[in-house]
């Protein structure tokens, strides 16, 4: 039971990333078919609010980032957008340092792993963005000439990259704010419901402004648009916010965001199969470097959880009866 409890945060985050990957594939499909990104955001949060509200009421008695990410993905490919979005853990880590949710001791191996992992992640992003390389002829694609016809020119790629990057920063700020809020408002179900409700209201305002004079965008039929709205609302907004909040309370925002590469891997495979999206060597190498960097961060965070810094370390040191014992315990803890 203790082992299962320890592994539960990892299992939940892996399953959540698989769920996110399905949403990204469906979202890319409906965007290619002309669905408004603003209307999609409204419906998604509306569904999530309806689903979460009864549970929050019984048990308990971030729209800007999503719009920018979806808009960026519209100008590029699903794989590229997800891979670029993997800077999220690095950005979250930097913001967590600023807001004192994370600590770094340069003589500590675990702190060095987090710093090196963050730098490695940024390096992987640069490789993926600047280096294209030859096309990879995967056995399930039609060959090197197969390409996604949406957003393949250089100007669209740059525009998409900028939008996704801004969206990434916005979502990192949201994660930090959620972590701070959970310290004083520990009801995860209620918080997730409020996030979805406020997201719906904000999304309606943005959609009415951006889609002014175009009421047809609100029409939804029995097609992939309805499937995308329902799936993303229940799995990615309702469950996503709730599970993220539960795990974040014990492991922190950096741990939650560090699992994004799993979503990228699933999206890359599914996109190449479903959309016949071309894979390039440069992006594959960059994605590999990103994964290495991010899991260095995960390792460092795991050690943080195993050997917490403050206030547990201070309490442990206070229990030492002699200065020699204090020095010995401090040396052991800080060397990990």
Curated annotation (Swiss-Prot):
Keywords: Membrane, Repeat, Transmembrane, Transmembrane helix. Residues 63-126, 169-298 form the EamA domain. It is a multi-pass membrane protein. The keyword Cytoplasm does not apply. Pfam families: EamA. One of its GO terms (molecular function) is transmembrane transporter activity. It is found in: Membrane. GO terms for cellular component: membrane. The chain crosses the membrane at residues 7-27, 45-65, 79-99, 115-135, 160-180, 189-209, 227-247, 255-275, 279-299. It comes from the Eukaryota. InterPro entries: EamA_dom, WAT1-related. The keyword RNA-binding does not apply. Belongs to the drug/metabolite transporter (DMT) superfamily. Plant drug/metabolite exporter (P-DME) (TC 2.A.7.4) family. This is WAT1-related protein At2g37450.
